[in-house]
Design a protein with these regions (language model features):
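Glycine-rich segments within core transmembrane alpha-helices of 12-TM secondary carriers
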Residues: 57-82, 104, 282-296
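Hydrophobic core of transmembrane alpha-helices in multi-pass small-molecule transporters
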Residues: 18-37, 243-259
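Helix-to-loop junctions at the C-terminal end of transmembrane segments
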Residues: 202-215
Length: 341
């Protein structure tokens, strides 16, 4: 994944190879997203299956802050890069964030090679050997799609309440506030950075809540809160007040989004059996990210264009998707993962 990100920064310009440049960019972005699924699933399961049962929620919530750290670093680098002259930014400055990703590859490889399989998975492999079924009859991907496709579908729906408001606030709202409200893009980016910083303690808080109340209850709360905050978020944004706009982001992201994101590792992993947990969690989560999050900026842009760049339909879309996630959480089993041996 790190190599693919670095290669994006090395792409030749359109003037050099023409239409091949955007084609290569699409391919690299596809590969990047594909590999993120494997990285996220592996990191999440390592924490979930190593963690002691009564502290699993808070510890697995910390694993989700890795993405927030990336968002924080990316936003910070982007703010620095945008200080370059426009010509330099468009010529070579945009490459800097991608090239800097190479600095993270070696530490990641070092940590990866020092990790062993989790106790839960080792216990499963031991039992498998005892039962004389060392040869797997079916690949995990095929097995999980055939046997636990309902869990995959549930995760896709569950991700709407988490992904839609996140991409709405960090992508669509930045552009919309700049063009329609005349708010400087840097102002919104600073607010986004603040919410990223606040997300660290909020993830721990919601992780602790999941240990006490269960993942499903926290997820239902978060989804309903997102639905309730869809319209107020835009009202606060329209105020053009830094304090009120920040409040809108804190409510939608740090309470709504963070409560959902924090419990996803334990919640999603608990929906699958150990031999297919990695594949099932990753497939469901990443398909959900594509369907729920990837298309959100485009859907929001199209909906806003219906009524002369109004946000009303956009907020309505957030409400509907959040309610769908709340229903999915209601019917999903709040599975308790076994304690690590």
């Amino acid at each position: 994944m790190g190599a693919v990100t670095f290669l994006i920064g090395c792409l030749p310009s359109y003037a050099s190879i023409g239409a091949l440049t955007p084609a290569l960019l699409v391919i690299l972005r596809f590969l990047q997203g594909f590999m993120v699924g494997g990285e996220w699933g592996g990191a999440m399961l390592m924490v979930v299956e190593y963690a002691a049962g009564k502290h699993r929620g808070r510890l697995s919530a910390l694993s989700q802050t890795g993405g927030l750290t990336g968002q924080l670093l990316a936003t910070g680098v982007f703010i620095v890069v945008t200080q370059l002259p426009q010509e330099a930014l468009l010529s070579w400055g945009w490459r800097i964030p991608f090239l800097l990703s190479a600095l993270l590859v070696l530490p990641g490889l070092y940590m990866r090679h020092r990790l062993d399989e989790t106790p839960v998975f080792r216990a499963f492999k031991k039992q498998q050997a005892i039962n004389h079924r060392q040869q797997r009859d079916e690949r995990p991907v095929v097995k999980v799609v055939r046997e636990q496709w309902r869990s995959i579908l549930l995760i896709i729906i569950l991700r709407f309440a988490e992904s839609v408001p996140f991409f709405l606030a960090t992508v669509f709202a930045v552009s919309w506030a700049t063009t329609q409200l005349g708010i400087a893009s840097l102002t919104i980016l600073y607010i986004v950075m603040f919410t990223c910083l606040l997300a660290y303690p909020m993830h721990v808080l919601f992780g602790i809540m999941s240990d006490r109340r269960g993942c499903r209850q926290v997820y239902i709360f978060g989804a309903l809160f997102v639905a309730a905050m869809a319209f107020p978020f835009f009202w606060l944004l329209e105020s053009r007040s830094l304090i009120l706009m920040t409040m809108g982001y804190v409510l939608l992201i740090n309470i709504g989004h963070n409560s959902l994101n924090a419990v996803q590792p334990s919640f999603f992993a608990g929906l699958f059996h150990p031999p297919v947990r990695y594949s099932g969690s990753s497939i469901g989560a990443q398909l959900g990210a594509v369907v729920a999050g990837g298309f959100t900026p485009f859907i929001a842009k199209a909906l806003s264009a219906v009524y002369d760049n109004s946000w009303t339909l956009v907020a309505g879309y957030v409400v509907l998707t959040a309610l769908a996630s709340a229903f999915a959480a209601k019917i999903a089993p709040d599975t308790v993962l076994p304690h690590s041996p």
